Amino acid sequence: MEFSHPDTELAGQPIGYWSWAACKAVVGHTRATLARHGISQPQWWVLSQLTASEEGRTRKELTAVLGGYLDVGSQLESEMDTVVARGWAAQDDAERLRATAEGVAFQDELAVLQRSLRARIHDGIADEEYVRALKVLQRMIHNVGGTAWHH
């Protein structure tokens, strides 16, 4: 890969631009790939949470975990509705959502897809480099008084 600038110039490049460009490219690629398989990224997050919990999750619990992901917030409720409408989850009388057998099978397929997405995104990047990049980003978030957390 050819980089955009020599290292001496990269050191002066704006993090706001490069973090935005990385987000746009990676999230755009991920969402386009998931869409080709008939699911949105927020629906995939919901389904992943449901398949990871035999007890299921309430909408409130799902919102507490997923609400801050890429500012999905207000659309999360409709994404949960879609997961139920598509038959990937069912809501019981106690208002707990649980993955259906169809949802579990679909999630298993998507897990393979997600691993291939991750492999492509991380191609040529050692785990040590990735960890360092995340720590740098977390430090920058901290430096400006921001907060971020991913389960």
Regions found by a protein language model. Give the residues of each.
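N-terminal helix-turn-helix DNA-binding core of bacterial DNA-binding proteins
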Residues: G28-Q75, M80
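Charged, amphipathic alpha-helical coiled-coil/dimerization segments
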Residues: D81-K135
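Residues at secondary-structure transition points
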Residues: L10, Y17, Q41, R57, ...
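Generic alpha-helical structural context detector
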Residues: Y17-W20, S48, H142
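Alpha-helical linker/hinge and terminal dimerization helices associated
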Residues: A22, V26, L110-G124, M140-A148
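N-terminal leader segment of winged-helix/HTH proteins
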Residues: M1-H37, Q41
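C-terminal regulatory/oligomerization modules of transcriptional regulators
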Residues: M1-D7, R57, V131, K135-H151
